[in-house]
Amino acid sequence: PTLCCTLFPYTTLFRSKPIIGCEVYVAPRKRTDKVHEYDAAMYHLILLCRNEVGYRNLCFLDSAAFTEGFYIRPRIDKELLRQHAEGLIALSACQSGEVPRKLLAGDYEGAKAAALEMRALFGEDGYYLELQDHKLPNDPAINQGLIRIHQETGIPLVVTNDAHYLRREDAEMQDTLMCIQMGKTVDDPNRLRMETSELYVKSPEERAALFPDYPEAVENTVKIAELCNMDFQFGVHHLPEFKLPEGYTDGDAYFQKLCEEGFARRYPGAPAEYRERLAYEMGIIRQMGFVDYFLIVSDFIGYAKRRGIPVGPGR
């Protein structure tokens, strides 16, 4: 979430439409199950934000994956997906997705059932089966199975491509970086490496050429992009509402009271210029619209001090 907020404003400079999403890991059982024999083989799933509701749900899922489901990797489960599917579009993911993995295992009916379950969660236009061709040995079998599921269920197809680098010629550079990361050499035959140089950002023409019999699957990339309309309101403060004590209906009046009490306690008999400075600082806070913020900070700082919790200086 932090990175997408950082990059989001720059998309207008390049006249591009940002699609906010995440590849998540889905636990094969429950996110709280952590028995290696059963729970190490998690599934991949792509989640894209249609709108602000979807963004909030994605943020919740991402947080829960780390705080509740972390086992080897941060994981969610289908229970969480059922509760937080609104505003999201799901894609079946790469060979590590649940549907492709069941197809590779020869369990066509299981793959079909998993796809139907996802469609039930995300809606008729909220779940897509990904056709990919990275020139990997298993690609044809997976694609044939996905096309069959599409024909029998009507779940739409979409042409996608895993992108680990920008251009095809960058494959060697990425391979070298992986060696550096894992402390291996490029001539080590047993090291982890990508099995193809097709994991780059392909043009629309290249993707269409890979699946000439399924033009609608290529067109669905545009359809999905049109369904995703997430925007951020930068420069607008979204503070929680501060609950005022009994007898106050105006935060500004309560802010004034606290400042006056604190000033009298710290500076009894202070000269006039001190009071002028207080009025100036309070005016700036009001002008910036930060009265509620200062009340909130004052509240939790006071709570900490009353309970002996150390409080550091503000920055």
Language-model features: locations:
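Short, well-ordered junction/capping motifs at the entry into regular secondary structure
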Residues: P1-L3
